Each structure stands twice: as C-alpha cells, then as structure tokens.
Amino acid sequence: MIIDGKRIAEEIQLEIKELIQQSLCRPPCLAVLIVGSHPASQIYVNRKTAACKAVGIASIKCELPFTISEEELIREVEKLNVDPQIDGILVQLPLPPHINSNRVNYHIDPQKDVDGFHPLNVGKMLIGELDGFLPCTPFGIKTLLERTGIEVCGKHALIIGRSNIVGKPMAALLMQSYPGGNATVTVAHRYTKNLKELCLQADLIIVAIGQPKLITADMVKEGVIIVDVGINKIHDSSKKNGYQIVGDVDFVNVAPKCAFITPVPGGVGPMTIAMLLYNTLLSYSKSQNLNL
C-alpha cells in the first residue's frame, strides 16, 4: 500500500484551520528567517508561508543578506523572541558556512522553537516528555504511521541516516515507551558495513541519507514498511525540466514487496509542513492559555 502523505497532511491542516477559526484571539504567527537567496530555500519558505495562509496562520518572512554575521543573525532572532505577536520562529537551513546553525538555534526561545531543534526541546524528547515541540520531519513520520494504523511496538526499526534533523530524533521517538513507540531501533550511517543484512532484518525502514535509489529490491524482505525521506534530483531527458525527483528508495522495484511505502514526492514532505503548522498552533495556544 502506498501511503498518501499529501492526503493525511491535508486532513491535519483542515483540523488546524478549524481550531484557529474557533479561537477569538489574534491568529497565530510564524516568523521565518532566510539568509541569502538559495533557490531551494526560497521554494521551501514559500511553501511554508503558503501553507500558513491556507490555515489562517499569519507569517512574516525575514529576508537577510548572505553576508550577515552570526551575531547579527542572533540579534534578529532575539528581537523575535521578545515580540509577543510572534508565536513561532524558524531559521531556514542551510545557513552560509560562516554561521553556526546550532549556535543560532540555541538562541531561539524554546517556547517559540517550532522546528524543535533547541537543546531544551531535544532533551525533553530524549527523556520521553513529548508534550513540547518535536522536530517536524520525525513528528510527521510518527503521525503518518499512527494515522495509517501502523503499529511499531516490538518491530525492528532501521533508521538509515543520523542527522540531527531526521535520524537522531527519529530514533529517540521510536524507542520511547509510549503508544507509537517501543520499537527496537538500529541506526545505520555511512560507516555501516552490513547495510543489506540490516535491511533484510528490518520490519520498518526509515531512510534519510540523500542518495538516490540506495535501497533496492534485493535489500528488503516481503511485507516491510518503508518511509522514504530522501529528496534527490536525477537527470531525466523525458521530463520537460530535464530531471525527476526521486527518493532514497528504488520505488518502482521495491514497492511491490512492501506492506506500506511512502512515495517521493507526496509522502513525508507534506507531513513536515503540516507538523510545523501544528507546532505553531501549539505555541500560540500556550501563549494565549487556550485549550485547543
């Protein structure tokens, strides 16, 4: 079965829109800081602000020059921290090489950290306090599995990739002792020598490594569940733009062996944006003392 992440994300966005319409206060507001004119970043930010508008969340796009210093960027973040009209702050990655993204994230108010990357929120997640802000992509995957009715308890989950954005927090969520967790988790990375062996053992594979069609049909068992987080451009002369977007899984050949699989595009990507909207609503509801 192909999991339609776009449909599930639309359901979540409709729920968020209805909750916002019930509120008598000001609309929630998300501030997005983007440094430089990286084309992909501009596309991602525009998608996020469009999604905000669709559900009734106000958004502010703060465009800053590529040459901005780390200290200047931190000052911009701190201005937003103390602005009572701002509920969520997101610093669009990647940042220029002269800026330490971790240090910038440390300066975001944890109560406005809707990306879920502040050390306080990461720490709360690690000790099982899941009522705060969870990183949007792992949160989206968790929600996708739950809404599809997939039980991960007792399953062997293999996470391929150990980034701070996807791999590490995903492992933390799946191993937690709560409904939707309790998996036996293995994390693979570039130095893992027996990847095929691990894949064949896994009941659930979540791959986020940025390598097109890394996972092939001979690497997975029948009935596996696969969540493909990869987004890769590959040359395709049959396409008008000369390329196609693929994931980290050889979808055409792997899908027939899967009990469930997410497509690329239309799988995890829409869920990431939906959970950003959810986190913004959560921050807003806390600041306004609302029980939404």
Swiss-Prot record:
Enzyme Commission no: 1.5.1.5, 3.5.4.9
Pathway assigned in UniProt: One-carbon metabolism; tetrahydrofolate interconversion
Any one annotated GO CC term: cytosol
Reactions catalysed: (6R)-5,10-methylene-5,6,7,8-tetrahydrofolate + NADP(+) = (6R)-5,10-methenyltetrahydrofolate + NADPH; (6R)-5,10-methenyltetrahydrofolate + H2O = (6R)-10-formyltetrahydrofolate + H(+)
CDD domains per the UniProt record, alphabetical: NAD_bind_m-THF_DH_Cyclohyd (cd01080)
Keywords on record: Amino-acid biosynthesis, Histidine biosynthesis, Hydrolase, Methionine biosynthesis, Multifunctional enzyme, NADP, One-carbon metabolism, Oxidoreductase, Purine biosynthesis
Origin superkingdom: Bacteria
Positions bound to NADP(+): G161, R162, S163, I231
GO biological process, one term: methionine biosynthetic process
GO molecular function: methenyltetrahydrofolate cyclohydrolase activity; methylenetetrahydrofolate dehydrogenase (NADP+) activity
Subunit (UniProt): Homodimer.
Function comment: Catalyzes the oxidation of 5,10-methylenetetrahydrofolate to 5,10-methenyltetrahydrofolate and then the hydrolysis of 5,10-methenyltetrahydrofolate to 10-formyltetrahydrofolate.
PANTHER family: C-1-TETRAHYDROFOLATE SYNTHASE, CYTOPLASMIC (PTHR48099:SF5), C-1-TETRAHYDROFOLATE SYNTHASE, CYTOPLASMIC-RELATED (PTHR48099)
Family per record: Belongs to the tetrahydrofolate dehydrogenase/cyclohydrolase family.
Protein name, as recorded: Bifunctional protein FolD
